[in-house]
Swiss-Prot record:
UniProt keyword Transferase, yes or no: no
Top-level taxon: Bacteria
Organism per entry: Thermoanaerobacter sp. (strain X514)
UniProt cross-references to HAMAP family, sorted A to Z: GcvH (MF_00272)
Protein name: Glycine cleavage system H protein
């Protein structure tokens, strides 16, 4: 499983890429691999105010449907409609296929997430 350096990871297998006071959120390689071929993605509304732990969206595969949770508080600034049009993008490039761009409300929440090294150890225990 690919784990990229420089991202933050949640125990629910979401990744967060921080750029200033904004963050891109998506699902990890482990998550997409576990789901199998992704056939449908539901994203949040632009402008939605989300709290950490809220459902960010839904990813459906031929095997299962899975909620995706936001690991941080934030306002949805943008969604990636390309993955709605072609959900297989997430299978092919999970770290390039973000789901939502949010305005971070509290950067200290990032301290609750895992680094790449911590996430690799977490995956070894899964």
């Amino acid at each position: 499983m690919e784990v990229l350096e420089g991202l933050y990871y949640s125990k629910d297998h979401e990744w967060v890429k921080v750029e200033g006071d904004k963050a891109y959120i998506g699902i990890t390689d482990y998550a997409q691999h576990s789901l199998g071929n992704i056939v449908y993605i539901e994203l949040p509304e632009v402008g939605a105010e989300l709290s950490a732990g809220d459902v960010l969206g839904v990813v459906e595969s031929v095997k299962a449907a899975s909620d995706v949770y936001t690991p941080v508080d934030g306002k949805v600034l943008e969604v990636n409609n390309a993955i709605v049009d072609d959900p297989s993008l997430v299978n092919n490039d999970p770290y390039g296929s973000w789901m939502a761009l949010v305005e971070l409300k509290d950067k200290s929440q990032l301290d609750n997430l895992m680094t790449a090294e911590e996430y690799k150890k977490f995956l070894d225990e899964e």
